[in-house]
Amino acid sequence: MKGQAAVSRIMNQLYDLEPTVEAPDYPRAATELLARQKKHALVIMVTNLRDEDTDDMRAAVHALKKRHSVLVASTRESVVDEIMERPVHGLSDALRLAAGQQYREHRLRYLNELRANGVDCLDTPPESLSVDLVNAYLAMKAGGKA
Protein backbone atom coordinates (compact mmCIF):
# COMPACT_ATOMS: atom_id res chain seq x y z
CA MET A 1 0.00 0.00 0.00
CA LYS A 2 1.41 3.37 -0.97
CA GLY A 3 0.73 7.09 -0.90
CA GLN A 4 -2.49 8.52 0.45
CA ALA A 5 -3.98 5.06 0.93
CA ALA A 6 -1.16 4.19 3.35
CA VAL A 7 -1.60 7.43 5.29
CA SER A 8 -5.36 6.84 5.50
CA ARG A 9 -4.80 3.29 6.72
CA ILE A 10 -2.44 4.49 9.46
CA MET A 11 -4.94 7.15 10.54
CA ASN A 12 -7.81 4.64 10.59
CA GLN A 13 -5.79 2.23 12.73
CA LEU A 14 -4.96 4.99 15.21
CA TYR A 15 -8.52 6.25 15.52
CA ASP A 16 -9.63 3.64 18.06
CA LEU A 17 -6.29 3.35 19.86
CA GLU A 18 -6.81 3.50 23.63
CA PRO A 19 -4.30 3.29 26.48
CA THR A 20 -4.43 0.42 28.96
CA VAL A 21 -2.82 -0.27 32.32
CA GLU A 22 -1.61 -3.69 31.20
CA ALA A 23 2.13 -4.18 30.86
CA PRO A 24 3.18 -4.66 27.23
CA ASP A 25 4.69 -7.96 26.14
CA TYR A 26 7.07 -6.69 23.47
CA PRO A 27 8.89 -10.00 22.84
CA ARG A 28 5.60 -11.85 22.30
CA ALA A 29 4.30 -9.13 19.99
CA ALA A 30 7.53 -9.24 17.97
CA THR A 31 7.44 -13.03 17.73
CA GLU A 32 3.83 -13.03 16.55
CA LEU A 33 4.43 -10.27 14.03
CA LEU A 34 7.52 -11.97 12.61
CA ALA A 35 5.53 -15.19 12.20
CA ARG A 36 2.69 -13.44 10.37
CA GLN A 37 4.45 -10.72 8.37
CA LYS A 38 7.09 -12.27 6.13
CA LYS A 39 7.53 -9.34 3.74
CA HIS A 40 9.29 -6.12 4.73
CA ALA A 41 6.90 -3.70 6.44
CA LEU A 42 6.88 -0.60 8.58
CA VAL A 43 6.26 -1.65 12.18
CA ILE A 44 5.02 1.13 14.45
CA MET A 45 5.30 0.46 18.17
CA VAL A 46 3.10 2.91 20.08
CA THR A 47 4.05 2.93 23.75
CA ASN A 48 4.82 4.99 26.81
CA LEU A 49 8.41 4.09 27.60
CA ARG A 50 9.11 3.32 31.23
CA ASP A 51 12.19 2.03 33.00
CA GLU A 52 10.79 -1.47 33.36
CA ASP A 53 10.06 -1.77 29.62
CA THR A 54 13.44 -1.02 28.08
CA ASP A 55 15.04 -4.48 28.18
CA ASP A 56 12.00 -6.23 26.67
CA MET A 57 11.56 -3.52 24.06
CA ARG A 58 15.26 -3.59 23.16
CA ALA A 59 15.04 -7.33 22.41
CA ALA A 60 11.82 -6.95 20.41
CA VAL A 61 13.11 -4.03 18.35
CA HIS A 62 16.36 -5.88 17.64
CA ALA A 63 14.42 -8.89 16.33
CA LEU A 64 12.00 -6.79 14.28
CA LYS A 65 14.56 -4.54 12.60
CA LYS A 66 16.27 -7.54 11.00
CA ARG A 67 13.32 -7.80 8.60
CA HIS A 68 11.30 -4.60 9.00
CA SER A 69 11.58 -0.85 9.36
CA VAL A 70 10.71 0.06 12.95
CA LEU A 71 9.28 3.27 14.34
CA VAL A 72 8.96 3.57 18.12
CA ALA A 73 6.37 6.20 19.01
CA SER A 74 6.52 6.94 22.71
CA THR A 75 3.80 9.09 24.20
CA ARG A 76 5.18 11.64 26.62
CA GLU A 77 3.23 12.15 29.83
CA SER A 78 1.90 15.70 30.06
CA VAL A 79 2.08 15.60 33.86
CA VAL A 80 5.88 15.30 33.69
CA ASP A 81 6.05 18.37 31.46
CA GLU A 82 3.83 20.24 33.92
CA ILE A 83 6.01 19.23 36.88
CA MET A 84 9.11 20.45 35.09
CA GLU A 85 7.53 23.87 34.50
CA ARG A 86 6.41 24.48 38.10
CA PRO A 87 8.45 26.87 40.23
CA VAL A 88 10.50 25.38 43.08
CA HIS A 89 9.48 26.70 46.51
CA GLY A 90 10.80 24.04 48.83
CA LEU A 91 12.32 20.62 49.29
CA SER A 92 9.28 18.67 48.06
CA ASP A 93 9.17 20.76 44.86
CA ALA A 94 12.91 20.24 44.35
CA LEU A 95 12.55 16.47 44.82
CA ARG A 96 9.63 16.34 42.40
CA LEU A 97 11.64 18.34 39.85
CA ALA A 98 14.65 16.03 40.27
CA ALA A 99 12.47 12.94 39.80
CA GLY A 100 10.90 14.43 36.68
CA GLN A 101 14.31 15.29 35.27
CA GLN A 102 15.63 11.80 35.97
CA TYR A 103 12.59 10.28 34.25
CA ARG A 104 13.07 12.53 31.20
CA GLU A 105 16.80 11.78 30.98
CA HIS A 106 16.22 8.02 31.08
CA ARG A 107 13.65 8.23 28.27
CA LEU A 108 15.90 10.45 26.19
CA ARG A 109 18.91 8.19 26.74
CA TYR A 110 16.93 5.12 25.67
CA LEU A 111 15.41 6.84 22.63
CA ASN A 112 18.87 8.03 21.59
CA GLU A 113 20.17 4.47 21.95
CA LEU A 114 17.41 3.24 19.65
CA ARG A 115 18.18 5.99 17.13
CA ALA A 116 21.89 5.11 17.23
CA ASN A 117 20.88 1.56 16.29
CA GLY A 118 18.91 2.69 13.25
CA VAL A 119 15.45 2.85 14.77
CA ASP A 120 13.25 5.85 14.05
CA CYS A 121 11.69 7.29 17.20
CA LEU A 122 9.09 9.80 18.28
CA ASP A 123 8.66 11.26 21.75
CA THR A 124 5.41 13.15 21.59
CA PRO A 125 2.43 14.14 23.72
CA PRO A 126 -0.63 11.94 23.12
CA GLU A 127 -2.61 14.78 21.58
CA SER A 128 0.02 15.14 18.81
CA LEU A 129 0.51 11.43 18.18
CA SER A 130 -1.54 10.99 15.02
CA VAL A 131 -0.10 14.03 13.23
CA ASP A 132 3.46 13.24 14.33
CA LEU A 133 3.09 9.62 13.20
CA VAL A 134 1.90 10.63 9.75
CA ASN A 135 4.77 13.13 9.46
CA ALA A 136 7.27 10.48 10.59
CA TYR A 137 5.86 8.01 8.07
CA LEU A 138 6.14 10.56 5.26
CA ALA A 139 9.73 11.40 6.29
CA MET A 140 10.64 7.70 6.41
CA LYS A 141 9.04 7.16 3.02
CA ALA A 142 10.93 10.12 1.53
CA GLY A 143 14.13 8.66 2.98
CA GLY A 144 13.44 5.21 1.53
CA LYS A 145 12.83 3.57 4.91
CA ALA A 146 9.10 2.87 4.62
Sequence positions of predicted segments:
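Exposed, interaction-prone extracellular/peripheral surfaces
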Residues: 1-146
